[in-house]
From Swiss-Prot:
Protein name: Small ribosomal subunit protein bS16
Taxonomic superkingdom: Bacteria
Source species: Idiomarina loihiensis (strain ATCC BAA-735 / DSM 15497 / L2-TR)
Gene Ontology MF annotations: structural constituent of ribosome
UniProt cross-references to InterPro entries, sorted A to Z: Ribosomal_bS16, Ribosomal_bS16_dom_sf
GO cellular component, one term: cytoplasm
UniProt-listed Gene3D superfamilies: 3.30.1320.10
Keywords, in A-Z order: Ribonucleoprotein, Ribosomal protein
Any one of the GO BP annotations: translation
Gene field: rpsP
Length: 82
């Protein structure tokens, strides 16, 4: 099954997450199909906290992809802000 989930990056105590489309059998930080955004939970000042390509997410959901709980919340927040 294809899922849209967060892939952790960044440094110790400074997480940074890529929003990726991946096969659910692959490791969290492993192989992915496409990047569709990012989430920076420790953004300060003018730094961008969230970027989501809603068109690509809708495309993948129409193909049967499942959103993880956290990604679903972030997409909802991004849609409300836009």
């Amino acid at each position: 099954m294809v899922t849209i989930r967060l892939q952790r990056g960044g440094a110790k105590k400074r997480p940074f997450y890529q929003m990726v489309v991946a096969d659910s059998r692959n490791a969290r930080d492993g192989r992915f199909i496409e990047k569709v955004g990012f989430f920076n939970p420790v953004a300060r000042g003018q730094e961008e906290k969230l970027r989501v390509d809603v068109d690509r997410i809708e495309h993948w959901v129409s193909k049967g992809a499942q959103l993880s709980d956290r990604v679903a919340k972030l997409v909802k927040d991004a849609s409300a802000a836009a």
